[in-house]
Curated annotation (Swiss-Prot):
One of its GO terms (molecular function) is photoreceptor activity. The gene is hop. Residues 56-61, 132-134, 185-196, 259-282 are cytoplasmic. Keywords: Cell membrane, Chloride, Chromophore, Ion transport, Membrane, Photoreceptor protein, Receptor, Retinal protein, Sensory transduction, Transmembrane, Transmembrane helix, Transport. Light-driven chloride pump. SUPFAM superfamilies: Family A G protein-coupled receptor-like. GO terms for biological process: phototransduction. Gene3D superfamilies: Rhodopsin 7-helix transmembrane proteins. This is Halorhodopsin. The chain crosses the membrane at residues 30-55, 62-85, 110-131, 135-158, 162-184, 197-220, 230-258. InterPro entries: Arc/bac/fun_rhodopsins, Rhodopsin_retinal_BS. GO terms for cellular component: plasma membrane.
Length: 282
């Protein structure tokens, strides 16, 4: 039974009557799929320990806030990937007419959207603070990002209409365009003023290039065109998560630790450089 379920998972389909326990056993029976999840749990755990050690001596409030934001990334990931590997946040949905797997129950690891909805805003908070951005731009980026993740989840869970799955996908991509605009235009200018352009541009490019991969693999995976099976898509997502989250957070936190005085001198508040703060009247 377990081998049959594992084979079904590898092909992107599972029988409708599978329980959570059976899904868990089937995931463990698919080496490619299981390894894509367990490796993230392991790396997230190591990242948490490393980041706590790296940020232990930070004293500036802005630097500490960046540290907390970066630390939240692996904390969210380890929770989410544990949910995935246990089968708790994995379901199987019958694909609508028009889908390449129409009528089949397709494995849907919707727990990934929980990861993205909680971790990617933390990445943006850290980047916004690094750029010296104001609260309005930060709020815009974070809310658009959450909208992107929620509508992406809607695309994955919609089974009533194949067309509506793609409508949700387009809406999600529209939110993504807003995030890209803030990153590439608004925050790039802010970072120049703040004097953090070099590290910001490195992290910006890393983020943009990798984040562009997520909608591409969604479209190619079982949730979209079904060109790639579930295990391959899972590894694609996991690989991008490793670089876009753990490596990103490490590079940012290392820079903040080495340049805490620069961070401390950037602003008294979001988007308010110290040099521009007028003294209070006597």
């Amino acid at each position: 039974m377990m081998e049959t379920a594992a084979d079904a998972l590898a092909s992107g389909t599972v029988p409708l009557e599978m329980t959570q326990t059976q899904i868990f056993e089937a995931i463990q029976g698919d080496t490619l799929l299981a390894s894509s999840l367990w490796i993230n749990i392991a790396l997230a755990g190591l990242s948490i320990l490393l980041f706590v050690y790296m940020g232990r001596n930070l004293e500036d409030p802005r630097a500490q806030l960046i540290f907390v934001a970066t630390l939240m990334v692996p904390l969210v990931s380890i929770s989410s990937y544990t949910g995935l590997v246990s089968g708790l946040t994995v379901s199987f949905l019958e694909m609508p007419a028009g889908h390449a797997l129409a009528g089949q129950e397709v494995l849907t690891p919707w727990g990934r959207y929980l990861t993205w909805a909680l971790s990617t805003p933390m990445i943006l908070v850290a980047l916004g603070l690094l750029a010296g951005s104001n609260a309005t731009k930060l709020f815009t980026a974070v809310t658009a990002d959450i909208g992107m993740c929620v509508t992406g989840l809607a695309a994955a869970l919609t089974t009533s209409s194949y067309l509506l799955r793609w409508v949700w996908y387009v809406i999600s991509c529209a939110f993504f365009v807003v995030v890209l605009y803030v990153l590439l235009a608004e925050w790039a200018e802010d970072a120049e003023v703040a004097g953090t352009a070099e590290i910001f541009n490195t992290l910006k490019l890393l983020t943009v290039v990798l984040w562009l991969g997520y909608p591409i693999f969604w479209a190619l995976g079982a949730e979209g065109l079904a060109v790639l099976d579930v295990a391959v898509t899972s590894w694609a997502y996991s690989g991008m998560d490793i670089v876009a989250k753990y490596l990103f957070a490490f590079l940012l936190l290392r820079w903040v630790v080495d340049n805490e005085r620069t961070v401390a001198g950037m602003a008294a508040g979001l988007g308010a450089p110290l040099a521009r703060c007028a003294p209070a009247d006597d």
